[in-house]
Amino acid sequence: MPTRRGFIKCLAGIGAGVLPWYGWPELLKNAIPQAVQASIQTSNSIKTTVNSVPQNDQTYLNRTAIDDILALTHSELQGRRAGTVGEEKAAAYLIDQMRGLGLEPLGDLMDNNNHNYLNAFTVYPVVEEFYYGRLTFRPGNPDDLRTPSANVIGGFMGTNPNESVILSAHYDHLGIFHGNLYPGANDNASGVGCILDVMRRLIKEGVKPNRNVVLAFWSAEEMGFVGSYSFVQKPTFSRTGIEAVFNVDTVGNGPLEEFALWANSDNKAVQAVQSAAAENKASVALTPNNGYNSDQVYFNMDHVPAVTLMAWDWLNKNHTPEDVLDFVNPQKITLASDILYRAVQKLVF
């Protein structure tokens, strides 16, 4: 999680058309490492309609958040730094999961007027530095060439296709620095696995929601929430129809039933999470962010009810090479997923 508000302002002028996307389409075809492919079964793209529950592959429905964390922290993904081949491989994994679950692509429009899963933008170069023992990024030379990056977005379409609730998590991390791999298991493969689990559960139930449930995997969060900022500035579906955003970040560590919430007010998203947490006998406190932030921030600035759910002890081992799979508590991921599932239910059914 970045700490510098100046960095956010520096990135505010980004656009998706600055750098051609020569590498992404071909790389995405072969991006999933063989070691990860061994645990999944690729399916063809499955189209959905507004009148049906997504058609899906049971293999994908049976996966778990821990499976997702294992895949995303694989060494071949090189820490998932935005603008790298590792990020592309992570995006390919997420697209494969969305296709397998039968989610409708909700990214950028293509030439045939259909949507892609990818939502493109570019990032400025950055310089690495340590801040109180945590590896962070600060802005590099803004005159240097920008690098392509992408959010990954898909949805379980509801009976009212003009209204949506977003479940989001950033999938990027810090990459490799000075020969050290930063796997980012808790930050934020845990959040990615958590919201995928919620979507699997919703689809398994086979009940079409009243509102769309959108999965949005943001990239370049570690560089200043660039992916979510880009989406807020140029959404790929109706901005006025976004009822709430439930963002999940670093949710898998610390005491089992203790969570924190970040938001700019006691909005409907906050209230839904607090109510759902009470049903699970968990503690979720709306807390000051103390200079830190996450991807709810630009939605809040744009007057969209949005909240970030995170572990109370999220800073422990954050942005260090020790943020590995063994650091994540599967029981806490399960609890967080159930809280989010109940919160989403309150707004989409």
Name every feature range the model reports, one short phrase each.
Residues 316-349:
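His/Asp/Glu-rich mid-to-C-terminal helical/loop segments that flank catalytic regions of hydrolases
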Residues 64-67, 71, 85-97, 116, ...:
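Extracytoplasmic/secreted proteins, especially bacterial periplasmic and envelope-associated proteins
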Residues 167-173, 177-223, 340:
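Alpha-helical metal-binding/catalytic segments enriched in His/Glu/Asp
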Residues 218-317:
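Metal-dependent peptidase/peptidase-like ectodomains
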Residues 80-155:
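A non-catalytic alpha/beta surface segment that caps or lines the substrate-entry region
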